[in-house]
């Protein structure tokens, strides 16, 4: 069994990098070049000729030396030429237009505004221009009525050109939501009419006032970083979870990164991954809203703690189904070059059918993370190599899974509770992890005992050396998982029994 999970060794027969040699004809060509016979000029020789040089002896010798070296590297034949890559065409400039008396005034991008306005001669005065209709743009979904200035404003303080510049900056911002206007509200209503949350197109998610079309049915969880609510569209039937992230980071690039992440996550189609429907922002509150699949069975953390209050514990059979589902979800992500990086009981969810799925994963890490307890941006479930700042792979998720299952089985977090505080330094946590020995103890007084294969599974997950830790796909072949796959467990009945005593629950 040990050989099955041992990382494969290198199959290379030559451990050293082979020495590369030039062909004979290139060597002869290099020798002739070193003798001063420069038949072809190197592409770098002209680049290194500075326009500020005084043709000194040192500059000439340096250029000659670089030419000979570059000829040795690039001059494969006397007729070979190096083609320059074509320069991509520039982006079309932003054009703002206004018509008055049949004349259309066009203004290019912000880099040319000052020059264009200095050369602009029209037959209307500044105040006549201000008293005219608001400027219209060819950009869709942008309200530019704010460009119209107050007549009492001095021309030198906030002039018409500077107002156009602000309009250009607004139109090129990284926001994904269109500003609120009557036309946009009508357009948004048309886009969502007769559709449910999982049927909305990308254009509908670009409207920040989409939240006005959402009805909140209850609060699923709250924290300092945001909240999760049970929701439904006003004209829809499908219940979904709406996650609100309160962030003070209004950087467009930061929000673009999250949007790219969610767009990528929407493409995932797996029975073990929570489905993402869409995302929109509220610029006034700097909040990010993420709509995702509703999981009525709640999180694994809430489940095992609820049973613990009632004097119960999750059985090994149920833990086996949880481990299998998580490993299959991680394997699916691994096939798409994605590392979850935040496996813990709060991010493993169950629905009312007993299906187990993963949520809250992405490239931005803490940008879309859960509301769980973290310290200085580092999770208690983080693998040793990540805390040390070393390169890590998908096996870091296996470590987190082992720690999660150990917590669920034991009914408490595996580390000694008296040593854990929210403000613990990373070096102290690393010391605890490296000196930590997993202990899955039997509890005869509660009639709880664990199999040897389950203990072995935990041991492999918690290998401190990442090179000895198996991948999720390899862990699916562990004898304990293989044995659990053969056992039938009614997970729907388990979820119903777990929460049957809740009368006012959501």
Curated annotation (Swiss-Prot):
Keywords: ATP-binding, Kinase, Nucleotide-binding, Serine/threonine-protein kinase, Transferase, Tyrosine-protein kinase
Domain Protein kinase: 214-481
Record's keyword annotation contains DNA repair: no
Annotated gene: MKK2
Family: Belongs to the protein kinase superfamily. STE Ser/Thr protein kinase family. MAP kinase kinase subfamily.
Binding site for ATP: 220-228, 243
GO CC, alphabetical: cellular bud neck; cellular bud tip; cytoplasm; cytosol; mating projection tip
Reaction catalysed by this enzyme: L-seryl-[protein] + ATP = O-phospho-L-seryl-[protein] + ADP + H(+); L-threonyl-[protein] + ATP = O-phospho-L-threonyl-[protein] + ADP + H(+); L-tyrosyl-[protein] + ATP = O-phospho-L-tyrosyl-[protein] + ADP + H(+)
UniProt protein name: MAP kinase kinase MKK2/SSP33
PROSITE patterns cross-referenced by the UniProt entry: PROTEIN_KINASE_ATP (PS00107), PROTEIN_KINASE_DOM (PS50011), PROTEIN_KINASE_ST (PS00108)
PANTHER family listed in its UniProt record: DUAL SPECIFICITY MITOGEN-ACTIVATED PROTEIN KINASE KINASE 5-RELATED (PTHR48013), MAP KINASE KINASE MKK1_SSP32-RELATED (PTHR48013:SF6)
Biased composition (Low complexity): 53-69
Miscellaneous comment text of the record: Present with 1950 molecules/cell in log phase SD medium.
UniProt GO MF annotations: ATP binding; MAP kinase kinase activity; protein serine kinase activity; protein serine/threonine kinase activity; protein tyrosine kinase activity
Active-site positions on this chain: 342 (proton acceptor)
Residue spans of biased composition, Polar residues class: 26-52
Enzyme Commission number(s): 2.7.12.2
CDD domains for the chain: PKc_Pek1_like (cd06621)
GO biological process: cell integrity MAPK cascade; pexophagy; regulation of fungal-type cell wall organization; signal transduction
Pfam name, any one: Pkinase
Originating species: Saccharomyces cerevisiae (strain ATCC 204508 / S288c)
Uppermost EC category: transferase
Functional summary from the UniProt entry: Serine/threonine protein kinase involved in a signal transduction pathway that plays a role in yeast cell morphogenesis and cell growth. This pathway seems to start by SMP3; then involves the kinase PKC1 that may act on the BCK1 kinase that then phosphorylates MKK1 and MKK2 which themselves phosphorylate the MPK1 kinase.
Region (Disordered): 1-69
Domain of life: Eukaryota
